[in-house]
């Protein structure tokens, strides 16, 4: 005698329920490790825009070193991830519901927000810390990044034969205004984002292709619609920091690259978006806040769509900037 359809459905439901409970038990045992996944890239999408680079955990000790200590601090960055000055919710407290309620969510197929993995969480913490560290004249790494930014921007408009005539800039002078700062003392512009603003500014000049960087620098320095490129970069870093503090970027980190590569790629993409709008709409300095608001809206809607601007197959930047 064949089983009744209702009994068959009940058996299938019981099996499915046991499977879900078994999976949840594994998650309970392994913790965040069971929830690891690469959410930096969409399945099947090009991944060139998010390239591997120097680990933020390697850069951090160099960026926080002070004049009184030439050697990096002995403590590792991860030792400080619970620093109360950094207002980040710890991974363990992200989901403080009872085990029963979480099992119910799984059984009912309710969407559950995945926790940040240790590497992504550490990157987020260090990014927020760097935003609080002021530029230090005595820190060799700070000066190296700043002078290299100057050279990258200056050389973008030169021919290869002119490179040899470029020398390291003096620390104070009108030449800093030509690369996008507000005054002859560039360090004063970093007050809003600390050395994170400097790091992102430098990374931007290395991340974008040479022909694109040349077009952007040319746009920023051509009167009468010129704009301070460095200041725009710092403002975009500030916008990204706001999104980071809100938790809007938490799901874009992974345990291979962490969160920092995505953060810096997003900064470069937002810079390109700013320049694309600025040129295509024939904007002036009076329109910059409107453009920043538009970039913020796009970040809130879909960070991935913004980051795809740097995809080599995307013609938008070629059509507007080149």
Curated annotation (Swiss-Prot):
Residues 141-303 form the ELMO domain. It comes from the Eukaryota. It holds the Pfam family ELMO_CED12. This is ELMO domain-containing protein C56G7.3. The lineage of its organism: Eukaryota, Metazoa, Ecdysozoa, Nematoda, Chromadorea.
């Amino acid at each position: 005698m064949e089983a009744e359809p209702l009994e068959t459905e009940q058996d299938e439901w019981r099996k499915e329920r046991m499977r879900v409970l078994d999976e949840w038990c594994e998650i309970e045992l392994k913790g965040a490790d069971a929830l690891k996944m690469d959410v930096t890239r969409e399945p099947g999408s090009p991944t060139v825009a998010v390239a591997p680079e120097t680990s933020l955990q390697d850069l951090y000790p160099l960026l926080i070193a002070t004049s009184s200590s030439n050697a990096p601090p002995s403590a590792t960055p991860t030792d400080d991830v619970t620093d109360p000055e950094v207002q980040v919710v710890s991974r363990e407290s992200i989901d403080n519901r009872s085990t029963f309620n979480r099992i119910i969510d799984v059984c009912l197929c309710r969407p559950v927000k995945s926790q940040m993995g240790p590497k992504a969480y550490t990157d987020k913490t260090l990014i927020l810390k760097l935003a609080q560290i002021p530029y230090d004249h005595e820190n060799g790494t700070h000066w190296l990044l700043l002078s290299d930014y100057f050279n990258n921007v200056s050389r973008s408009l030169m021919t290869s034969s002119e490179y040899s005539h470029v020398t390291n800039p003096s620390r104070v002078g009108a030449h800093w205004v030509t690369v996008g700062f507000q005054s002859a003392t560039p360090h004063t512009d970093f007050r809003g984002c600390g050395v994170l603003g400097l790091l992102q500014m430098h990374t931007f000049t290395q991340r974008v292709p040479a022909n694109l960087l040349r077009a952007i620098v040319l746009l920023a320095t051509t009167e009468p619609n010129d704009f301070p490129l460095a200041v725009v970069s710092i403002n975009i870093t500030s916008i990204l920091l706001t999104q980071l503090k809100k938790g809007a970027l938490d799901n874009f980190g992974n345990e291979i690259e962490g969160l920092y590569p995505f953060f810096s790629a997003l900064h470069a993409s937002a810079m390109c978006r700013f320049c694309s709008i600025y040129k295509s709409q024939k904007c002036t300095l009076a329109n910059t806040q409107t453009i920043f608001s538009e970039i913020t809206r796009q970040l809130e809607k879909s960070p991935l769509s913004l980051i795809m601007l740097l995809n080599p197959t995307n013609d938008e930047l070629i059509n507007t900037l080149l």
